[in-house]
Amino acid sequence: MILIDGKSLSKDLKERLATQVQEYKHNTAITPKLVAIIVGNDPASKTYVASKEKACAQVGIDSQVITLPEHTTESELLELIDQLNNDSSVHAILVQLPLPAHINKNNVIYSIKPEKDVDGFHPTNVGRLQLRDKKCLESCTPKGIMTMLREYGIKTEGAYAVVVGASNVVGKPVSQLLLNAKATVTTCHRFTTDLKSHTTKADILIVAVGKPNFITADMVKEGAVVIDVGINHVDGKIVGDVDFAAVKDKVAAITPVPGGVGPMTITELLYNTFQCAQELNR
């Protein structure tokens, strides 16, 4: 069994990116810049954004965090985004979710200039993903999953891939990326009947449902590749959506939780920020 080590791979990829960013800055005198916006005082949001700031510094990308009070109105937030859209020194914009209930998430996402939409959530980028447009900014977690498969030499062409979970953030975009990579793809969700009949056929099984140890050994094919996107807190520990202890000896390769997909998400955010800077300054 191969352990797909996202932490180690992420470190290698950041080192590669740091070299590319340094060369880019030397050749263009442009420093890629990410602006992250937090609305309110959600502790998890602050932790996530702090880790993104730290990662930016590691590769030579400028970052700025704008923290707005909980009572910020939607129109005030949209006005700020408009200013950032028109600021040529800002290449990438991230609005940390969740937002307070009085702010419409979609209105906010749709207001970000597609070329600065570092999370890849804007409908333009969703459409570009479908069309395999090279200018597409791919959603960070799905992009990280595909990078893991590629870097570990896991063949997608002709493979049967099953994605459990159909969210806009992970399930749908990773299904599309797998399709683009010439896999045959089935996307399962809460209305799927007889889930096991699908998962036991998967050469590549990707799970993103937010339910601890949801996928058990009897649901996985011998020799499959398993990517566990879940992050769940159980008895003070972080566990995935896959019963790792039971499944690991049955599969060819598997990601751990923590230390699997998570670190790759932030690394791909850095790569997307660099892509934004390059595209905006062509």
From Swiss-Prot:
Pathway: One-carbon metabolism; tetrahydrofolate interconversion. It holds the Pfam family THF_DHG_CYH_C. GO terms for biological process: L-histidine biosynthetic process; methionine biosynthetic process; purine nucleotide biosynthetic process; tetrahydrofolate interconversion. SUPFAM superfamilies: Aminoacid dehydrogenase-like, N-terminal domain, NAD(P)-binding Rossmann-fold domains. Its EC number is 1.5.1.5, 3.5.4.9. Catalyzes the oxidation of 5,10-methylenetetrahydrofolate to 5,10-methenyltetrahydrofolate and then the hydrolysis of 5,10-methenyltetrahydrofolate to 10-formyltetrahydrofolate. The lineage of its organism: Bacteria, Pseudomonadati, Pseudomonadota, Gammaproteobacteria, Thiotrichales. NADP(+) binds at residues 165-167, 231. GO terms for molecular function: methenyltetrahydrofolate cyclohydrolase activity; methylenetetrahydrofolate dehydrogenase (NADP+) activity. It catalyses: (6R)-5,10-methylene-5,6,7,8-tetrahydrofolate + NADP(+) = (6R)-5,10-methenyltetrahydrofolate + NADPH; (6R)-5,10-methenyltetrahydrofolate + H2O = (6R)-10-formyltetrahydrofolate + H(+). GO terms for cellular component: cytosol. Keywords: Amino-acid biosynthesis, Histidine biosynthesis, Hydrolase, Methionine biosynthesis, Multifunctional enzyme, NADP, One-carbon metabolism, Oxidoreductase, Purine biosynthesis. It comes from the Bacteria. Disulfide bonds: none annotated. It comes from Francisella tularensis subsp. novicida (strain U112). Belongs to the tetrahydrofolate dehydrogenase/cyclohydrolase family. CDD domains: NAD_bind_m-THF_DH_Cyclohyd. This is Bifunctional protein FolD. The gene is folD. PROSITE patterns: THF_DHG_CYH_1 (PS00766), THF_DHG_CYH_2 (PS00767). Homodimer.
